[in-house]
């Protein structure tokens, strides 16, 4: 992608000391926005790296509090030509450890950066160093029950590798690029308190694909015992965090938050358009695009399918039939009176539900999430006889002023979103896509949306174009908003 090529060329030109330090087997995928790019940056080059991030419009994002570690930051970038996102997992400290708990800091950053090599123009960790780090990472992350389960599966299918497919592929990839003598020298130069012979034996078994579950368990125990001096937190703190994570991953417990959020506050985005403008499809695709790394929620403000609305509609249908066939003017009048109030109750219920959704959206945005809404109720459409997703009782002001005022006051509490994207198109184009609606109502909705003018909050989007062009334009505008 253009952004990767230009960004890393800039870092190289400005002599920023960095390298891609793990999973180089998937480097190409990372450079194309398919997976993370794990970068190690020299502490003394942090300012230069930060300047480069700003120059190329990378945006800081935050992991959930339980997944934040000192010297580790996250950024996302945007490739304008493809509209793909890339994720930089930036390390100033080499922090690693168990699954969900990076409790160790290996202070070997200087060595990794001094011995880096280049793949084309991309600096990467030396293969022998990467293999050593991969062995440590894999065995720290391996749980005893996972090793036992894998061994059980191996009994059923002997050809099965001793690790999961992804891990095995990475280890085999690195072994093929590793010289045993250089690997031994790396062990000696780093001087980590681990057994050189044990690691050399492991390398030989790995190259011959003869690793057993016993080998994995023994090496795992050895790594944890020998690297205890590299723990970055106290044993008590470490045990407390581990117990908390174990508890929260039990069945029926509230799931731990995994998605990243914006640093200060999130955004509420509204897609507004008449029927046939592609709102629902755009909401789905934008949610898929952003939720790769960010916490994204979609909120539908349309009329909900609920027991209340179903009951009201059934009651009014029955009352309508009764009003048509029962004799007596007074009876008919009373039935119309009842229908009017049950209908009003339904619209007030819908208004209260929309207000609750607005408050929920604000709460989500305040915690850094992005909220994408469909059929957002806007006061901008209040001049319509039947405002789109807005108050419906104005015409009943003579009969039930209290209900009208209650509905109006409810909608008045719903503020504007951070950005309204008005999906504007000619009526004939929308009619081709959606021709099963009342034509006059459809025309009024199209005219109302097309009447929206650009402002600080409103961004008109021309949808008289191929869908992919519309989607790319929306992605570019949303990126500017983040």
Question: What name fits each language-model region?
Answer:
Residues 1-35, 41-267:
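Conserved NTP-donor binding/palm subdomain of two-metal-ion nucleotidyltransferases/polymerases, i.e.
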Residues 215-218, 222-240, 422, 428-482:
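NTP-dependent small-molecule kinase module
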Residues 274:
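P-loop (Walker A) phosphate-binding loop of NTP-binding proteins
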Residues 279:
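Conserved lysine of the Walker
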Residues 282:
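Hydrophobic positions on the alpha1 helix immediately C-terminal to the Walker A/P-loop
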Residues 293-309:
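Short beta-strand-centered segment that lines the nucleotide-binding/catalytic pocket of NTP-utilizing
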Residues 304-395:
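ATP-dependent small-molecule kinase phosphotransfer cores
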Residues 375-451:
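A glycine- and Lys/Arg-enriched "phosphate-lid" helix/loop adjacent to the NTP-binding pocket
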